[in-house]
Amino acid sequence: MNKLKNKVAVVTGASKGIGASIAKHFAVEGAKVIVNYATSKEGADKVVKEITDKGGTAIAVQADVSKEADVIRLFEETKKAFGTLDILVNNAVFQQFLPIEQVSVAAFHQHFDVNVLGPILTIQASLKLFGDKGGNIINISSGASKYPLPSASLYSATKAALDAITISLSKELGVKNVRINSILPGATETEGATSAGVTSGSEYEKMFIANTPLGRRGQPEDIAKAAVFLASDDAAWITGEQISVSGGMYGF
């Protein structure tokens, strides 16, 4: 408890799934949390209520991370509410399973605008609030960045790009006392995975479980606990890394 006491954290895409779990785990550890959402105000408000009902501090802020003006407003609201920023979690994601014949220009931009441009914009904005004290960035990537999935060429490519950004920026931002790491979740049960076609009993789920040594799909809290570790001083000498949290599926 209190590993993140008095820290201020922005978690993008935090109205459900992994992002919601990270926001709630951060709050339990003492962080003040900005629960970002793009469209699901109801979900974000629910996360905030769960946090505040337990004595934590959180606010919900709408922003589409692929839009520069929205990102600027997100961090202006953060500064207005808490005056500073210590932790950024880039969790907002767009994902579709599409065979190559169905990949459109629009689908390309949807994936890359949210999954690659979004983190670039939020990182730029966060650096201004980190200031001289430095900060901590966690990018939620995917094991698909190392082991691309069939019918997921766009999604896999965006996550590979995000890992490259993590590595490059670790070398650039270390002198500013900013740590940056990626978490690579395995097959995790989330609303997003379900909407992408990974449903209970589906062939995708059977494939994932068959290739996971621990024999189950992950839960959002499995990822959230790793995020707490990376956000805390326990990980003070860790930067530029890709941490696989996959039940052994993505061992590398």
Q: Where would I find each of the regions flagged by the language model?
A:
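Substrate-binding pocket helix/loop in short-chain dehydrogenase/reductase
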Residues: P99-I100, A107-F112, Y204, F208
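Conserved glycine-rich cofactor-binding loop
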Residues: V8, S15-K16
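Short C-terminal tail/terminal secondary-structure segment
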Residues: Y147, V228, T239-F252
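A glycine/serine/threonine-rich, flexible loop-to-helix segment
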Residues: V175, A187-T212, D222, F252
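Active-site helix of classical SDR
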Residues: I123, T158
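Residue(s) in the substrate-gating loop at a strand-loop-helix junction
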Residues: S142
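Alpha-helical segment proximal to the catalytic Tyr-Lys
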Residues: K128, K171-V175, A236
